[in-house]
Amino acid sequence: MASYKPVVIPAVPKLGEKITQDTLYWRGYKTPVQIKEFGAINKIDFSPVPPYNYAVTASSRVHIYGRYSQEPIKTFSRFKDAAYCATYRDDGKLLVAGSEEGSIRLFDISGRAPLRQFDGHTKAVHVVGFLSDKYRIFSGGDDYSSSLWDIPSATEIVSYSEHSDYVRCGCASKLNGDVFITGSYDHTVKVFDARTKSSVMTIEHGHPVESVLLFPSGGLLVSAGGRYVKVWDVLKGGQLLVSLKNHHKTVTCLCLNSSGQRLLSGSLDRHVKIYSTTSYKVVHSFNYATSILSLALSPEDETIIVGMTNGVLNVKHRKPEESKEKSQKKRQPAYRTYVKGRNYMPKQEDFFVSKPGRCIMRKYDKLLKSFQSSKALDAVLEPHIRLYTPEVTVAVMQELNRRGTLRSALAGRDEKQISLLLTFVTRRVIEPRFTPVLITVADMITDIYQPVVGQSALVDKQFLRLQEAIGREIDYQEELLEVLGMMDALFATLTEKRATYLEENKSNGLTKTLDQDISI
């Protein structure tokens, strides 16, 4: 008796992933380290100076982590309620943070108690940072105002009340010590100059603005809000250069790499997209477990950190590059390895014993082996098979048809099972690789259950959907045939013109070949 041969699942060729230099570069990070914080992480900021520690703002604390440490090396907890947007100064010596109660606190990295406290906002302060002159602080709060503060005197210099909704993001120019930018939920981005009493530029983003970023050159501004990341030319009065829509949910954070050639964006859709700042196309993407609130890249691009809504801090360090001198060469096999067994001469009385390989059969193969056609069809109609590997379902249907038992496997089913079959056929019949088999299945289902049509509203609805799907496919085929007819006419006309042109050249004694003819 011949052994059972498992059902052959036709393999469909897959397109290989395009490997680029960016792909190789961004894959060069180690397995991430997970650090659990006390709450959602709203801000991550790297110190601009070595050893590049980073500040993490979560819940009512600001933790300072060493670059490779998994435990905080310092904690600032002098907040009555939630803390927001802890940011380093350019020299890495001071840290400023906003709070839910509306006050702003300035900390010395070497101490624990706040050096200064700035009071003036009446509601939560979600954005705070240093101007590039190092002696002033800008802030924005839920009271719709943006303020400028003097560090030595701990007083408010000027306050702007131009936004009509919460101010949730901001940044300062690195070239001009008087310029800072704020973004608000009123869909606008405003550019302020400390020397003026009002904003100098207003940009309409179109969605609540979650993050803004100014290029180091000061000429380009990036805003994120809704599903959009937009790039603006500040030197041309806020002209829109490009609008990127590569996320499926709200974009919450932005970041630039050290060279300014790559822009990173994080979103609630759990993705970090990396764009080229020349073509503004996505060159790589990272996937994470939950929604992303904050994102930071170390000054040397050696560490990428993502903060998520569940309070998890995801830290990826770059793999060290191995020098060619230190890399050990693989040991070459000994000579006896190559000549082993070459001098053996088989004898006539030798017995050759072949060990049969163990074949693990799937559930549907076991049922087919025992000729249980109906149960085999039920096995491949399970959700995890019909939804994710429909080629297995179709292959079993094809095998049942080859055996002549497909009709008996389809017969004798209740309303729910018939509806499931029709749903699968309707969804997959338009795929060319499944069409021949599923047309046969559809014909058999129609023949078997035609007498009961009209007795079940659910089955009737599925039959109508199948009819609509087949009708649409027939219309597509007719349109394609029309296009093929047009193309045949064009090719025929082109062939006639070339033949006429060639005859004219021959009659004139020209020796030009058809490959050198002018394009028609």
Curated annotation (Swiss-Prot):
The keyword Metal-binding does not apply. It is found in: Nucleus, Nucleolus. CDD domains: WD40. InterPro entries: U3_snoRNA-assocProt_15_C (IPR018983), WD40/YVTN_repeat-like_dom_sf (IPR015943), WD40_repeat_CS (IPR019775), WD40_repeat_dom_sf (IPR036322), WD40_rpt (IPR001680). Keywords: Nucleus, Repeat, rRNA processing, WD repeat. Its main location: nucleus. Gene3D superfamilies: YVTN repeat-like/Quinoprotein amine dehydrogenase. WD repeats lie at residues 36-75, 78-117, 120-159, 162-202, 204-242, 246-285, 287-326. SMART domains: WD40. GO terms for biological process: positive regulation of transcription by RNA polymerase I; ribosomal small subunit biogenesis; rRNA processing. The keyword Nucleus applies. It holds the Pfam family WD40. One of its GO terms (cellular component) is small-subunit processome. Ribosome biogenesis factor. Involved in nucleolar processing of pre-18S ribosomal RNA. Required for optimal pre-ribosomal RNA transcription by RNA polymerase I. Part of the small subunit (SSU) processome, first precursor of the small eukaryotic ribosomal subunit. During the assembly of the SSU processome in the nucleolus, many ribosome biogenesis factors, an RNA chaperone and ribosomal proteins associate with the nascent pre-rRNA and work in concert to generate RNA folding, modifications, rearrangements and cleavage as well as targeted degradation of pre-ribosomal RNA by the RNA exosome. Part of the small subunit (SSU) processome, composed of more than 70 proteins and the RNA chaperone small nucleolar RNA (snoRNA) U3. May be a component of the proposed t-UTP subcomplex of the ribosomal small subunit (SSU) processome. PANTHER family: U3 SMALL NUCLEOLAR RNA-ASSOCIATED PROTEIN 15 HOMOLOG, UTP15 U3 SMALL NUCLEOLAR RNA-ASSOCIATED PROTEIN 15 FAMILY MEMBER. This is U3 small nucleolar RNA-associated protein 15 homolog. It comes from Gallus gallus. The lineage of its organism: Eukaryota, Metazoa, Chordata, Craniata, Vertebrata.
